[in-house]
From Swiss-Prot:
The lineage of its organism: Archaea, Methanobacteriati, Methanobacteriota, Stenosarchaea group, Halobacteria. The keyword Cell inner membrane does not apply. The gene is engB. Coiled coil: none annotated. This is Probable GTP-binding protein EngB. PANTHER family: ENGB-TYPE G DOMAIN-CONTAINING PROTEIN, MSS1/TRME-RELATED GTP-BINDING PROTEIN. It comes from Halorubrum lacusprofundi (strain ATCC 49239 / DSM 5036 / JCM 8891 / ACAM 34).
Amino acid sequence: MFEDRPDRDAEVVLVGRSNVGKSTLMRELTGHDFSTGGKPGVTRQPNHFDWASESFMFTDLPGFGFMSGVEEEHREAIKTNIVRYLEENADSILAGVVVMDGKAAVDIIDRHAERGNIPHDVEMFGFLEDVGVEPIVAVNKTDKIDDLDERLDEICDRLGLYPPWQQWSDQIAPICAKRGDIEALEECLRTRFHEHNRDDLLKFVS
């Protein structure tokens, strides 16, 4: 089980496959450095960054899926803990951000689907909806994508969102975390905070 979670009333969680840039995105959102690396699965426990006075925090949950040098049993345990964390804290989670590698996501999703498996990203997107947390998809590494609109349409299609992607701009956020280009995600988060009557949190995404 994950270590103790800080007792906060409001939270934004980052979820996604290993090595999609969640820790880099967490750094851009908080201004605080976290462990990052090219080796998938560096983050094994949640990273929390909180503001006690507002009872608010960002949480980077461990990556799921392939992790080099990590046994399948341990990967499954991490996934189980992620699911449990989201279930137990759904009432305080204002937004669940599913971070994807924009260049690789469609191929990975299609490869799993062809094997008859539910792709992890699609499963997590649906799971967040099931527990009452409206997901935001942060499509990262846009600097590596040739035709961004086409790729975002394809991702929407895989998630069951009817293209064009622009009509889902409150849920689909193209970003490039390593370049600090996260404005589309911040706009989505501002919308969520306002919907939850937490305009006091807008300063954290401005």
